């Protein structure tokens, strides 16, 4: 109890700039939806809209590539996040929290620290609205449930039939493994183990290290359970086959199946919500 009070107080001190009030302030280019489960869905790279008056980022002097300077959108992840929220509600009777960037990544990148996320100050409000919502929702989940799961949804083309896990090799799910042991991170009843059972091809399948390009970025590193937010956070990199329009609903159904089972095992025990 003392640790939880300390974490809450510290989160206000460290993340007060993200506005930890009851409701995120609305922004036309950030879709937010309050949930009734200890589950948060994030999709920072699926948007296709311009930020008015903002030029495309150039990335001068920045290294390019996965985890570095990128302007391509993760096609289909906006639609996947919304479909997944619907599928979770259908299975569990309640909706998860949802934060989706509708602005295109070439104007601002919500999965980078602010100093690397945008070049035009006029893009800052959209970026901050995204993180305000995530910070507030993490705080709400921590307050109401004491534990939670943040799934940060991305797309990749390195392996079109695979979903890559990104937790900084377990760092962003520190509390999960402390509570339930390493099998909760890499065993058959881990989230990715449950994804595999649901019919998805995943990597890593066991205790192997995560693929170097997809180990988890700014969002999971900012809100993961190794931080004051105390929410287990997993970056999910979906191959193209999972994100094409005709497959999004099927993908959402499979992922929702894994989410429901994971929640029963690790999130909702002895809870009255």
Language-model features, listed with the residues they occupy:
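N-terminal export leaders
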Residues: 3-7
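N-terminal catalytic or cofactor-binding beta/alpha core of small enzyme domains
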Residues: 23-272
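Bacterial Sec-dependent signal peptides at the C-terminal "C-region" and cleavage site
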Residues: 10-25
């Amino acid at each position: 109890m003392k640790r939880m009070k300390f974490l809450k107080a510290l989160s206000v001190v460290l993340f007060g700039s993200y506005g930890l009030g009851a409701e995120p302030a609305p922004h036309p280019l950030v879709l937010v939806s309050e949930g009734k489960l200890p589950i948060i869905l994030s999709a920072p790279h699926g948007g296709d809209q311009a930020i008015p008056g903002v030029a495309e980022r150039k990335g001068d002097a920045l290294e390019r590539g996965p985890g570095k300077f990128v302007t391509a959108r993760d096609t289909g992840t906006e639609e996947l996040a919304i479909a997944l929220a619907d599928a979770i509600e259908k299975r569990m009777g309640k909706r998860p929290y949802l934060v989706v960037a509708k602005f295109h990544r070439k104007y601002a990148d919500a999965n980078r620290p602010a100093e690397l996320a945008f070049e035009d100050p006029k893009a800052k409000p959209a970026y901050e609205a995204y993180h305000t919502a995530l910070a507030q929702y993490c705080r709400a989940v921590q307050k109401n449930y004491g534990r939670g799961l943040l799934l940060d949804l991305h797309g990749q083309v390195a392996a079109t039939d695979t979903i890559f896990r990104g937790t900084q090799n377990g760092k962003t799910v520190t509390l999960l493994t402390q509570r339930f042991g390493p099998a909760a991170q890499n065993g058959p009843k881990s989230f990715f183990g449950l994804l595999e059972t649901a019919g998805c091809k995943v990597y890593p399948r066991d205790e192997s290290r995560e693929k170097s390009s997809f180990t988890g970025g700014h969002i999971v590193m900012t809100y993961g359970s190794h931080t004051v937010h105390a929410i287990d956070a997993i970056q999910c990199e979906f191959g193209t086959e999972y994100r094409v329009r005709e497959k999004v609903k099927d993908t959402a159904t499979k992922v929702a199946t894994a989410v429901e089972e994971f929640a029963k095992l690790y999130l909702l025990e002895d809870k009255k919500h």
